[in-house]
């Protein structure tokens, strides 16, 4: 869409009505409340590794731990606006352009609680643009997407959501205003867009959203294992919801996409790699493979979770001891080999990734290392295919 304009924030506000424009102007009390917090970039750069994210639903295996403490084990969280305490100021949430003031106060209090527990945590609000519950708009509203028969269209086969028509320019501007309101609240650091791909309508929408949230807010988009070159410069990170990880080809595609986004998306980057278990949460080799792939190919975040086919709720997961902070910061970029394996040096040890389809990989060090996967200490360690390991200079402590 060559004719799609590139808006800046001032120009975007000028396209909106007065009420919607006011909603995306920063609330002064919110700005004062957050003045002492580290900047987004500093929080991203200050965190240590491994670095895990939460996609909507939590880690649910730490039954005796306070829920906010478990959330704060993660370094990035995205969720619906309601999770953060925000409530749209309209009977139909999809028609709102601002939040109730009391909900902004609740949201700021929850943000403070979480950042007190993890000062490097990044908070992202999902903005719905493609599908939503049937209550999002009035039943016959013009922004529902309809098929040739005039009937509304399901969001996806097994879900109860309906699709919205983001081919309409007025609707795209409205979505952008909602994104701007979320960031303007001061409760979150940016917005997340699901079901992302490159097409003319999404490009037009993305330009409006970037103008609405400003240059410093974060935009996360779920492109799965695909790349989106047309919208890349507006996006800080992909939520790589990788539902295909059964073959060597699929793992190669994941690795190639992760390497691409680390070079081509907007800085600061917040790429989030998720794979799902095949048989159970005890597929520890798959968890380690996803974690070490993320560590060797990116400065991003990882997650290993339940598959969406379960009825219990998408993206539920365990918190694994392998994810406890042990590595410190990376000392250099990862080094990738022709066979697809990779290695990266950190302050406190070395990460090795061995992809599906490879032979077992043996690594030897000048001095003894402790394997985080086995607990064994020695100079030589073997990593099986579709697995990875963290090899520490000294045994790991009890850091979360």
What are these regions (language model features)?
Residues 22-23, 304:
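Generic macromolecular interface patches on structured domains
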Residues 1-2, 112:
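Generic anion/oxyanion-binding catalytic loop in active/binding sites
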Residues 15-18, 28, 374, 393:
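Generic detector of low-complexity/intrinsically disordered segments
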Residues 23-35:
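Bacterial Sec-dependent signal peptides at the C-terminal "C-region" and cleavage site
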Residues 2-19:
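N-terminal secretory signal peptides and thylakoid transit peptides that target proteins
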Residues 34-397:
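Glycan-processing catalytic domains of CAZymes
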């Amino acid at each position: 869409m060559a004719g799609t304009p590139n808006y800046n924030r001032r120009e975007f506000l000028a396209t909106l009505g007065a009420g919607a424009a006011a909603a995306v102007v920063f609330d002064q009390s919110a700005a004062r409340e957050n003045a002492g917090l580290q900047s987004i970039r500093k929080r991203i750069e200050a965190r240590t590794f491994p670095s895990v994210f939460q996609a909507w639903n939590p880690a649910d295996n730490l039954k005796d731990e306070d829920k906010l403490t478990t959330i704060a084990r993660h370094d990035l969280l995205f969720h619906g606006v309601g999770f953060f305490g925000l409530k749209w100021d309209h009977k139909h949430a999809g028609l709102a352009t601002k939040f109730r003031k009391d909900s902004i106060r609740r949201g700021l209090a929850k943000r403070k609680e979480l950042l007190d527990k993890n000062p490097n945590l990044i908070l992202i609000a999902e903005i719905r643009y493609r599908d939503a519950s049937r209550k999002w708009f009035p039943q016959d509203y013009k922004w529902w997407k309809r098929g040739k028969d005039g009937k509304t269209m399901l969001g996806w086969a097994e879900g109860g959501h309906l699709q919205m028509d983001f081919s309409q320019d007025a609707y795209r501007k409205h979505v952008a205003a909602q994104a701007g309101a979320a960031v303007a609240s001061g409760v979150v650091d940016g917005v997340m867009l699901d079901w992302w791909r490159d097409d003319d309508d999404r490009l037009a929408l993305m330009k409006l959203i970037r103008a609405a949230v400003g240059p410093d807010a974060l935009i996360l988009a779920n492109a799965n294992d695909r790349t989106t070159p047309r919208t890349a410069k507006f996006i800080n990170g992909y939520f790589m919801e990788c539902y295909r990880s059964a073959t060597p080809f699929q793992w190669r595609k994941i690795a190639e996409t992760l390497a691409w986004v680390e070079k081509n998306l907007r800085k600061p980057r917040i790429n989030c790699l998720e794979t799902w278990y095949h048989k159970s949460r005890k597929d520890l080799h798959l968890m380690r493979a996803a974690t070490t792939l993320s560590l060797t190919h990116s400065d991003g975040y990882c997650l290993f979770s339940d598959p969406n086919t379960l009825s219990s709720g998408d993206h539920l997961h365990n918190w694994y001891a392998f994810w406890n902070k042990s590595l410190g910061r990376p000392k250099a970029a990862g080094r990738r080999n022709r066979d697809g394996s990779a290695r990266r040096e950190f302050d406190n040890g070395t990460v090795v990734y061995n992809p599906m389809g490879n032979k077992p990989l043996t690594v030897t060090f000048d001095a003894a290392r402790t394997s985080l996967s086995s607990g064994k200490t020695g100079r030589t360690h073997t990593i099986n295919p579709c697995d990875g390991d963290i090899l520490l200079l000294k045994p790991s402590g009890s850091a979360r």
